[in-house]
Amino acid sequence: MALIGNESAHEALAAAMRNGNLHHAWLIAGPEGVGKGMFARAAALRMLAEAAGRDRLAPGWTVPPESQTAHLIEAGAHPDYRELVRLPKDPDKPDEALARSITIAQVRSLQALFATKPSFSPRRVIVIDAIDDLERGGANALLKNLEEPPAGTIFLLVSHAPGRLLPTIRSRCRLLRFEALDDGDVAAILRDQLPDATTGEIAALIKAGE
């Protein structure tokens, strides 16, 4: 799916990547449903593909789906990528209710990764979606990594309510502010997802979501 809307936030991170000024932690903050998690994952894929240097990459965030980096991330097997999200309450029923929080155990599981060097390039990327879901102990454990970031590691932290985060976490991150999508952006997303929908149907869906 194409990245639509919030181009200024996209460009801020892209510029940091081009200029070699990539801070170790980025807080991707804004209302729910505006593409923050999708952008974090697209950015992680692009960062790792660029660092690996094995693919011919066009400008923008796109990475060829046949690239090794894309295949490994899709399979959950990339050694330099981790994603922390709320897990199912019952591991045997992954399609049912999710746990209330991202646990401290999930955060601590990163330590084994940080004890080794990245495998495919000098870079690794951690996505947390959403950091608002961290248990208090998990937030404190993460803070230690943000204060003393492992070499080559980039944290992309999605937040729907950054004001509720520990001030010490916010202070160690560069902010990428995402805004609510306007009707034109919503229409573009709906056309991407529903290519057979008419203009009238798209307009009705936008109206229903107001």
Regions found by a protein language model. Give the residues of each.
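Clamp-loader machinery-focused feature within the broader ASCE/P-loop NTPase space
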Residues: 1-137
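Non-catalytic interfacial helical region
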Residues: 4-7, 88-210
